[in-house]
């Protein structure tokens, strides 16, 4: 049962990890998971919520990992950006099959594949009810897709950045390694930094903090969790300036 008859947010930026798409295979894209995520996004669109999406590329390629093995970091990051484009195209296709209008915008030009990122075009598409998938990160090496999510969220004036993870939110410790770890309902930006909690990388988190962009961390694998978050129900961990 929802606590609010209307969505708590009008416009959101949903950050999905590439790993979330790979399922149990450990690599690539699981079509069943992709379709489920598309259906959950469709629910939000039907509620009248404007949805921007950023997807990581870790299910296909990780530039940082190969950089450690000797590859030039800039080259590796460029390859990682292209992986996020592939995930974005897959998500757009899944949304189209679910009868949801969606566009992929890339931070690096890929003529004939997807649209170039343009702030004004993105806002217009969102207002018209289309899902906008922001790919290729920020277009620059050395920045994560979490940074891209916060940047795009700020640019499109989203009400919140929703970071989808494999756990129920932010815990006092790693809940996988420590079953006694407790879930935080709310945190301030300062508390996250003071407690050295791993929400996202420091550059991304600082960007969100400086622009007072709320972040909610939740478990995308939990059925209905995304809808509950958007409806304002107690789900996951909310991070803002006055938690």
Curated annotation (Swiss-Prot):
One of its GO terms (biological process) is 'de novo' CTP biosynthetic process. It comes from the Bacteria. CDD domains: AAK_UMPK-PyrH-Ec (cd04254). UMP binds at residues 57, 77, 138-145. Pathway: Pyrimidine metabolism; CTP biosynthesis via de novo pathway; UDP from UMP (UMPK route): step 1/1. GO terms for molecular function: ATP binding; UMP kinase activity. Its main location: cytoplasm. Keywords: Allosteric enzyme, ATP-binding, Cytoplasm, Kinase, Nucleotide-binding, Pyrimidine biosynthesis, Transferase. GO terms for cellular component: cytosol. Its EC number is 2.7.4.22. Catalyzes the reversible phosphorylation of UMP to UDP. Belongs to the UMP kinase family. This is Uridylate kinase. The gene is pyrH.
């Amino acid at each position: 049962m929802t606590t609010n008859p209307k969505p708590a947010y009008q416009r959101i930026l949903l950050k999905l990890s590439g790993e979330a798409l790979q399922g149990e295979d450990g690599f690539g894209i699981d079509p069943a998971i992709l379709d489920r995520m598309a259906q959950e996004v469709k629910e939000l669109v039907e509620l009248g919520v404007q949805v921007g999406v950023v997807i990581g590329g870790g299910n296909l390629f990780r530039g940082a990992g190969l950089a450690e093995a000797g590859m030039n970091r800039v080259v590796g990051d460029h390859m990682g950006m292209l992986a996020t484009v592939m995930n974005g195209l897959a998500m757009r296709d899944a949304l189209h099959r679910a009868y949801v209008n969606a566009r992929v915008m890339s931070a690096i030009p890929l003529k004939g594949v997807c649209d170039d990122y343009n702030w004004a075009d993105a806002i217009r598409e969102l207002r018209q009810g289309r899902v906008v998938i922001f790919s290729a990160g920020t277009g620059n090496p050395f920045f994560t897709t979490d940074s891209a999510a916060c940047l795009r969220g700020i640019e499109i004036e989203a009400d919140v950045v929703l970071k989808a993870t494999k756990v129920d939110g932010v815990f006092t410790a790693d809940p996988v390694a420590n079953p006694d770890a407790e879930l935080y309902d709310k945190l301030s930006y300062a508390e996250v930094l003071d407690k050295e909690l791993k929400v996202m990388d420091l550059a991304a988190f600082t960007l969100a903090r400086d622009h007072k962009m709320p972040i909610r961390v939740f478990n995308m694998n939990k059925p209905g969790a995304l809808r509950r978050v958007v409806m304002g129900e107690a789900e996951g961990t909310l991070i803002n300036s006055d938690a």
